[in-house]
């Protein structure tokens, strides 16, 4: 595999980068933090996606800060095909989380996978390794220089087995073990099912089902014969019953017809009687109507004579009377209208007369009011003039009392008083301000004295408390010293116990390493013990089979004698191998027992070491506590000194404040006396000013009142003049009202005469209309009587026709009665006396017989159904018996098959175990050779002879004198060399094909800062190591380093730089 191209956007410190990889050795250099390792991480992430991230490093950390999306496009060549992986990521600023938004794998330009998980699986399948195996084989990350060294043997075994594809064999062995367990479970279930089926078969056969079925079938045949005979009897009874039913039905029909005929005769007779009755009613009604007709004729003749209608036809008479009534009604209406107009005119005149009288009264009232208002105005004028005279006299008295002459003198005096009052007020305010400042200063001094007293009291309390704290802390220090001595004695006892167990104080630091080594040895012995036990079981099985064959003497296949053959020799070799393995197994068990004792001793030593550690912690805590107490004592003493100095300065300050306060008291007393005198003078000035202003205000008010009264007098004189004009107008108006009243009264008298004449005319017209209306009503009544006479005549003719129809009906009913009576006699002649009862008795006997036969058939049928049900159950049992026998045979075959499968799975599991152990041994041997070869090539110091890699992947370094040493106990530089050698050895082993891969299918080697712990000599050896890896077929080697020698020897060199302003990295080829 070779990397071809890397295109990234917004990954770590790279905003955008398009980088092409070259064959050979490529060195990437740059200052710390420039983004070299980020470039390798981008390649790693391009291959395996987010699977490379650890728990402390999330996907969002890979995206450039502030970016919302990122891309990685990685192109590579593998086994002759061109591949391209496109990864895209999306970052949410809101949730601050990132996710994979696109993951596509192209092969030779064709899209083969387009989902993150599937792409990851496809890449793992292509490379035959996942991200962890890639790190352990080809990618040595910065900070993971000794991962394989520090790993536990079990983890190291898993890592290397996965790289060499041995983990598949372990997986297959586990699958075979699971299959064996499952087959054993199925075999047990099949055996239980076999026993259950067998027990069920025996239970069914014990009931003799075939004989029982034959007996029941014979009983069914007998029951069928009885049912056939009963069904014949039932059919005969049913036939006889049917005949009787028909005869009885016919008899009943005839009886029913006779009854119907009799009812019809009775109905005809009733209808005939009803017709006779109705005929008589019609005859009586004809006589009544004829009497009414005669009365109406006589009434019409009387009306004609009374009203003078003569022999005129009723229509002409009605027309004449209607015209007369209409003419009279029109005369009444015209008279009523004329009368209404006259009445309305009279009402209008009366209303106008009333309005004139009302206006006259109102005018007279206004006239009286005007005369009254003129008198009142004259009285007000006299009052106003009296008030003016009184106010003028009051003003004169006020001026004489105050000693003022003109109004100008009053204003000048008030101005002088105001200026004097202002000067006195300013003086009073000045004295009050000085007094306020003095009082405030006195209050501030008193507050300062109180604060000083409080502060001095706090200092005294703090000094007392500090001395108490110092005494308590000194006592605590003495107690801590005593406790430290006690813990040191207990610690000495613990070290004595450790010495008794054989551990020195210097060995306590390595107890965990000893414990881990012992546990690893224990696990290794346990695994070896299990392998030996499996091998011993296989040998015993082989011996048992060989002994059985030897006991028979001949080969069961070819018949050849087995004595002295290869089987006999193999049996002897197996016996010897068994004895040897048994001794080895016993030796391993002894070693395990010895390890258990060592582990117990180590466990006790760890307990004691923990106690000693706890005592050290307690002693350290007590010493720290003592130091803290001493610091507190020093602090308290310093504070006591500070508080004492503070007390002294506060005392001096208090004396100064008290002296200043005494002086202020004298000043305040003098200022209060000055303030009192100023207030007295100011009050007298204010009083004089107020009295002057009162005089001035009173004079001004009186002048204003006089002016107001003069205005009112002028107003009253104007009102009197207006009222005089109004009186003239009202007198003229009263004269006009008198003339209008006289004219209205004359007009009303003329209307009264006209109204009397109109009322007489209306009364005469009404009388004439009443008479014409009466005659019209008589004519209409005559018309109604004539119409009623016509209706009566029509009714009489209808009644006479009805009487004829009823006579015909009566003849029809007589004929009907005769015909039905003849039919009844014929039907009664066909009946045979009282034979119906006899037929009914026979029918009852046949019905009873039919019911009995049916009940017996039902009972026998139920018995037959029971027999058939039993037969069905037994037949089901026979069918079940057949099925169970087939199932029993199948279960037997299944059990034998599962037993064979179990044996095959057991043999397969053992085979996988042997193959894995064999392949692991071969790989370990090859890896050990390569490891020592490269270690001797790489390591320039001659302090170590070789490295041992045991079957459990435990690594041990041996010194020249043969002393073994754990790799983790090597120095940092030695561990770095050891790690490089181990990684390169694994890579070489994979290149040789032990893992099943072709050499050109391996990924490029990537070394991130491999020279961190190496000196100059080992750096030169690293260059040779890189050349060696190139010689075995590694097409690409990518190194991140600052070392100049690596840079000089590289085929391609790139420089990575980061812009400090934008924090973005860039790469250039050198």
From Swiss-Prot:
UniProt: Zn(2+) binding residues: 555, 558
Binding residues annotated for ATP, in chain numbering: 12, 32-38, 142, 969-974
Name this protein carries in UniProt: DNA double-strand break repair Rad50 ATPase
Subunit structure: Homodimer. Forms a heterotetramer composed of two Mre11 subunits and two Rad50 subunits.
Coiled coil: 227-257, 369-403, 449-478, 570-614, 878-908
Record's function text: Part of the Rad50/Mre11 complex, which is involved in the early steps of DNA double-strand break (DSB) repair. The complex may facilitate opening of the processed DNA ends to aid in the recruitment of HerA and NurA. Rad50 controls the balance between DNA end bridging and DNA resection via ATP-dependent structural rearrangements of the Rad50/Mre11 complex.
Domain Zinc-hook residue range list: 508-607
Organism in which the protein naturally occurs: Methanosarcina mazei (strain ATCC BAA-159 / DSM 3647 / Goe1 / Go1 / JCM 11833 / OCM 88) (Methanosarcina frisia)
Lineage, uppermost ranks: Archaea, Methanobacteriati, Methanobacteriota, Stenosarchaea group, Methanomicrobia
Presence of keyword Disulfide bond: no
Gene assigned in the entry: rad50
């Amino acid at each position: 595999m070779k990397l071809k191209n890397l295109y990234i956007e917004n990954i770590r410190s790279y905003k955008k980068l398009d980088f092409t990889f070259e064959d050979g050795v490529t060195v990437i250099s740059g200052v710390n933090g420039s983004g070299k390792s980020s470039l390798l991480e981008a390649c790693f992430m391009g291959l395996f996606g987010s699977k490379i991230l650890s728990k402390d490093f999330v996907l969002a950390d890979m995206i450039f800060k502030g970016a919302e999306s990122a891309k990685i496009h990685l192109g590579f060549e593998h086994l002759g095909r061109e591949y391209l992986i496109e990864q895209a990521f999306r970052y949410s600023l809101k949730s601050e989380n990132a996710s994979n938004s696109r993951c596509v794998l192209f092969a030779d330009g064709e899209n083969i996978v387009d989902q993150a998980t599937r792409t990851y699986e496809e890449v793992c399948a292509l490379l035959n390794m996942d991200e962890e195996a890639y790190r352990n084989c080809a990618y040595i990350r910065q900070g993971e220089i000794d991962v394989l060294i520090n790993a536990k043997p079990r983890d190291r075994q898993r890592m290397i087995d996965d790289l060499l594809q041995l983990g598949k064999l372990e997986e297959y062995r586990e699958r075979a073990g699971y299959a064996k367990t499952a087959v054993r479970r199925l075999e047990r279930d099949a055996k239980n099912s076999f026993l259950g089926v067998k027990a069920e078969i025996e239970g069914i056969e014990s009931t003799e089902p075939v004989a029982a079925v034959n007996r029941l079938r014979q009983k069914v045949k007998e029951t069928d014969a009885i049912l056939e005979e009963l069904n014949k009897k039932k059919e005969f009874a049913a036939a006889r019953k049917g005949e009787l039913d028909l005869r009885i039905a016919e008899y009943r029909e005839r009886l029913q017809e006779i009854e119907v005929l009799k009812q019809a005769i009775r109905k005809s007779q009733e209808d005939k009687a009803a017709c006779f009755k109705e005929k008589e009613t019609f005859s009586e009604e004809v006589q009544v109507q004829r009497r009414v007709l005669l009365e109406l004729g006589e009434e019409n003749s009387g009306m004609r004579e009374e009203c003078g209608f003569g022999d005129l036809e009723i229509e002409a008479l009605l027309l004449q009377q209607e015209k007369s009534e209409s003419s009279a009604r029109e005369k009444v209406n015209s008279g009523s209208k004329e009368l209404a107009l006259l009445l309305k005119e009279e009402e209008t005149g009366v209303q106008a007369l009333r309005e004139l009288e009302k206006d006259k009264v109102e005018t007279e009232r206004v006239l009286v009011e005007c005369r009254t208002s003129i008198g009142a105005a004259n009285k007000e004028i006299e009052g106003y003039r009296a008030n003016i005279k009184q106010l003028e006299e009051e003003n004169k008295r006020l001026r004489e009392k105050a000693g003022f002459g003109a109004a100008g003198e009053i204003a000048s005096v008030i101005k002088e008083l105001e200026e004097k009052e202002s000067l006195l007020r300013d003086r009073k305010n000045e004295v009050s301000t000085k007094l306020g400042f003095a009082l405030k200063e006195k209050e501030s001094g008193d507050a300062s004295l109180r604060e000083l007293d409080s502060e001095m009291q706090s200092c005294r309390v703090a000094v007392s408390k500090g001395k108490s704290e110092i005494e308590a802390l000194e006592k605590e220090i003495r107690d801590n010293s005593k406790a430290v001595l006690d813990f040191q004695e207990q610690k000495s006892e613990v070290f004595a116990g450790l010495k008794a167990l054989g551990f020195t104080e210097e060995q306590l630091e390595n107890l965990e390493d000893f414990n881990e080594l012992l546990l690893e040895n224990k696990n290794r012995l346990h695994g070896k013990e299990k392998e030996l036990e499996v091998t011993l079981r296989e040998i015993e099985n082989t011996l048992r089979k060989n002994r059985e064959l030897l006991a028979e003497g001949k080969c069961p296949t070819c018949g050849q004698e087995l004595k002295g053959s290869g089987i006999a020799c193999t049996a002897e070799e197996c016996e010897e191998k068994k004895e040897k393995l048994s001794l080895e197994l016993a030796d391993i068990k002894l070693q395990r027992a010895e390890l258990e004792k060592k582990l117990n001793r180590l466990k006790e030593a760890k307990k004691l070491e923990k106690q000693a550690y706890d005592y050290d912690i307690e002693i350290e805590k007590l010493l720290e506590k003592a130091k803290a107490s001493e610091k507190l004592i020093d602090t308290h003493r310093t504070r006591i000194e500070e508080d004492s100095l503070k007390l002294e300065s506060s005392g001096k300050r208090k004396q100064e404040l008290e002296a200043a306060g005494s002086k202020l008291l004298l000043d305040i007393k003098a200022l209060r006396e000055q303030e009192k005198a100023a207030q007295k003078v100011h009050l007298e000035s204010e009083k004089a000013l107020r009295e002057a202003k009162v005089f001035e205000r009173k004079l001004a008010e009186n002048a204003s009142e006089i002016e107001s009264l003069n205005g009112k007098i002028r107003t009253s004189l104007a009102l009197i003049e207006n009222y005089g004009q109004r009186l003239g107008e009202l007198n003229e108006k009263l004269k006009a009202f008198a003339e209008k009243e006289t004219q209205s009264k004359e007009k009303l008298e003329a209307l009264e005469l006209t109204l009397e004449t109109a009322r007489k005319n209306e009364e005469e017209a009404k009388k004439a209309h009443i008479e014409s209306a009466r005659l019209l009503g008589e004519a209409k009544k005559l018309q109604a009587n004539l119409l009623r006479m016509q209706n009566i005549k029509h009714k009489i003719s209808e009644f006479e026709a009805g009487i004829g129809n009823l006579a015909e009906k009566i003849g029809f009913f007589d004929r009907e009665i005769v015909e039905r009576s003849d039919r009844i006699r014929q039907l009664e002649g066909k009946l045979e006396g009282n034979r119906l009862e006899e037929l009914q008795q026979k029918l009852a006997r046949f019905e009873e017989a039919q019911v009995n036969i049916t009940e017996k058939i039902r009972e026998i049928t139920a018995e037959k159904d029971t027999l058939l049900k039993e037969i069905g159950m037994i037949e089901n049992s026979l069918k079940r018996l057949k099925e169970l026998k087939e199932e029993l045979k199948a279960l037997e075959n299944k059990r034998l098959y599962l037993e064979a499968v179990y044996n095959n799975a057991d043999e397969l599991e053992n085979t996988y175990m042997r193959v894995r152990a064999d392949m692991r041994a071969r790989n370990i041997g090859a890896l050990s050779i390569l490891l020592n070869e490269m270690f001797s090539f790489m390591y320039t110091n001659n302090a170590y002879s070789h490295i041992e890699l045991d079957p459990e992947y435990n690594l041990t370094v041996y010194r020249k004198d043969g002393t073994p040493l754990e790799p983790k106990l090597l120095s940092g530089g030695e561990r770095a060399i050891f790690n490089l050698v181990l990684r390169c050895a694994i890579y070489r082993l994979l290149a040789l094909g032990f893992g099943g891969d072709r050499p050109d299918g391996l990924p490029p080697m990537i070394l991130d800062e491999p020279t961190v712990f190496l000196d100059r000599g080992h750096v030169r050896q690293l260059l040779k190591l890189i050349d060696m890896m190139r010689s075995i077929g590694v097409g690409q080697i990518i190194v991140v380093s600052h070392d100049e020698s690596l840079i000089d020897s590289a085929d391609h060199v790139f420089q990575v730089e980061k812009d400090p302003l934008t924090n973005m990295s860039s790469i250039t080829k050198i």
